[in-house]
Amino acid sequence: MSNPDYCIPNFSQTVNERTIIDIFTICRYRSPLVVFCLSHTELAKKYAQDVSMSSGTHVHIIDGSVEITTSLYRTFRTIATQLLGRMQIVVFVTVDKSVVSTQVMKSTAWASRGSFVELRNQSVDSSTLVNKLENLVSFAPLYNVPKCGPDYYGPTVYSELLSLATNARTHWYATIDYSMFTRSVLTGFIAKYFNEEAVPIDKRIVSIVGYNPPYVWTCLRHGIRPTYIQKSLPNPGGKGPFGLILPVINELVLKSKVKYVMHNPQIKLLCLDTFMLSTSMNILYIGAYPATHLLSLQLNGWTILAFDPKITSDWTDAMAKATGAKVIGVNKEFDFKSFSVQANQLNMFQNSKLSVIDDTWVETDYEKFQAEKQAYFEWLIDRTSIDVRLISMKWNRSKDTSVSHLLALLPQPYGASIREMRAFFHKKGASDIKILAAETEKYMDDFTAMSVSDQINTQKFMHCMITTVGDALKMDLDGGRAVIASYSLSNSSNPKERVLKFLSDANNGKAMVVFGAPNTYRLAYAKKVGLVLDSAIKMSKDLITFSNPTGRRWRDYGYSQSELYDAGYVEITIDQMVDYSSDVYNGVGYFANSTYNDLFSWYIPKWYVHKRMLMQDIRLSPAALVKCFTTLIRNICYVPHETYYRFRGILVDKYLRSKNVDSISLFHYWSGSKTFTVLSHFEVPHECGPLVFEASTDVNVSGHLLSLAIAAHFVASPMILWAEQMKYMAVDRMLPPNLDKSLFFDNKVTPSGALQRWHSREEVLLAAEICESYAAMMLNNKHSPDIIGTLKSAINLVFKI
């Protein structure tokens, strides 16, 4: 271009605060990807045309015409540039499962935060297949299959959505949705950890720091038993040794409303039964049929003795197959009149811990029937041959009643319409207490008058029974211990020094503590550029005050990557955790994110990263981040591809000149695959040890690192995990024998089956040195030096000799 009037496009011409806020906004629906597997290429082509013409969807088809790993590489490298493009992306996969498995395609979809549909077992005229394809066109650009999960828990009727919209809480509902997804993923990740570390099934217990009710449900979906640990519990205000007999229903109960279960005809039993299944792996379930609410749970290791006259062998087999539990179905009524363990087959639980769920009811003389049940359960609690942990009994007493061993008498969440309560019997229950019928009637009147969400929230009384009161920072951290500390340990009541010491001890002791906290510098950056957040937020250095639309207010400390890495912790994204766990994940997905969620980061101990995660495949790849932000900014600014790499090369050249490297020592290519060739040996002094460049070697400065640094301004960015992987993969590594090699399609594989190195140490550290200049260029000096500084500091710690 010799015309002197021609101006080379650059980022300063376009990027301003409005541009940056727009990028934050786009992140709400980032990665609008659907991966759809079917066996019919012509059908895929038809619907590809339909969805493209109707909604502008970008469509790719993997049909076997190109070798599968090459096809995956080309397709998903292309998609990586489009994930912030505001247009839906659909990939149709029509190759056979023997060529690329369901698991590989699910992992690949989830790596880009996509929805996944597997229908390769459906015939071309299958109504299921056709309906899914029709929905793909009808619901574009938001397909009605959740991202990164098999289920969704949010509003399912238009009236709920309308209520949210008219109260200006639609954005906040997306925050709740994604928060639930996050908790579900953390649980799935712990399940993966238990599997990999071969933790015995009866030891698969996770400690939850702080209280949030969804963990009970999502733990049981992953075959894990939860326990809570809290610094204190508000006094329930009821009778009995723990105040749980008709506890007071006041603002302490109602202030944190969490709706979390999916619509289900037996929804009223889900809260109760998941809680009871958490108390023991041996369950006597009386009145079990049909128990469809249990079918989505994973109960490997549980033994369920189920009594119900409607039980059949088919029901027993189906329940066992769906849940993985050992199910013994008895198709008769339980004998409450016979005070005998053997009469009801309970001798199988001798010398075992047992919990009992009672959901029985009779039409005739129900009061007498309840008295018989109560007497039997009081007797059973006193048996020494069986360790009865807890008994829940359906309670609808209409007369004054004296009770022994009563620990709690609680309203049944979702049970207001039938005025149902649950009595809980335990060895430490009240030895002799009188329950007045008039008192319970008044109590249920008050309960019935509450809103449904308030009624649901009373489940926290049940969860008090699996809660330990104590200081989480003093808990024992033996190897094999699993702890989820998300949205909790970062609370301002926990000094940062103690938290970092606790995490350091966890890493050194090879415990699995997953830690989540606000990201100090990303939050500060969002506020600096004027982003309107989903929650009102004030900052004083690293102390953050949150006020959400529900009226709740709390304070947290923010944390940075470098201070967590100093404590032995590495940032990993929720996306990577769900993808890494995709073979065991049985939680929920989501549809929309929120800026609030993107202010948080999650961290896992370095010992686990070094043991399990140094070999990067698509599940642990930052592929969904490394291209989309830089491509979006480059396209907004109309900066040509070649010009972008030339700008990047100039930054490298400028840095090397500042280190007195003679220009005759290298030859610049300034391309995407090669930054320069070393003509003669030179070294650059560096705090991590000298950077050594040998003659005749090609140097490709890491674009991944630079792209991750830009992404880190907007979303959680796993730069340190990536750096740990680059350090390990700085030499060729053999493919692991226990993984499908298709997961490594984004890597280069040698003919001998080795993964070629990604980058040399020098290429990574050289990129880190130009990182701030690069961010300043891309964001027109509206970058965050703090974000870049903490990333660079942590990377230097990774590579320090």
UniProtKB/Swiss-Prot annotation:
EC id: 2.7.7.50
Class in the EC hierarchy, top level: transferase
Annotated compartments: Virion; Host cytoplasm
GO molecular-function term, one example from the UniProt record: RNA binding
A GO cellular component annotation in the UniProt record: virion component
GO biological process, one term: 7-methylguanosine mRNA capping
Top-rank lineage group of the source organism: Viruses
Keywords annotated in UniProt: GTP-binding, Host cytoplasm, mRNA capping, mRNA processing, Nucleotide-binding, Nucleotidyltransferase, RNA-binding, Transferase, Virion
Record field: catalytic activity: a 5'-end diphospho-ribonucleoside in mRNA + GTP + H(+) = a 5'-end (5'-triphosphoguanosine)-ribonucleoside in mRNA + diphosphate
Pathway: mRNA processing; mRNA capping
Record keyword Nucleotidyltransferase present: yes
Functional note: Enzyme involved in mRNA capping (Potential). Binds to GTP and might have guanylyltransferase activity. Together with the RNA-directed RNA polymerase P1 and protein P7, forms an transcriptional complex positioned near the channels situated at each of the five-fold vertices of the core.
Family label: Belongs to the phytoreovirus protein P5 family.
The protein's name: Putative mRNA-capping enzyme P5
UniProt source species: Rice dwarf virus (isolate Fujian)
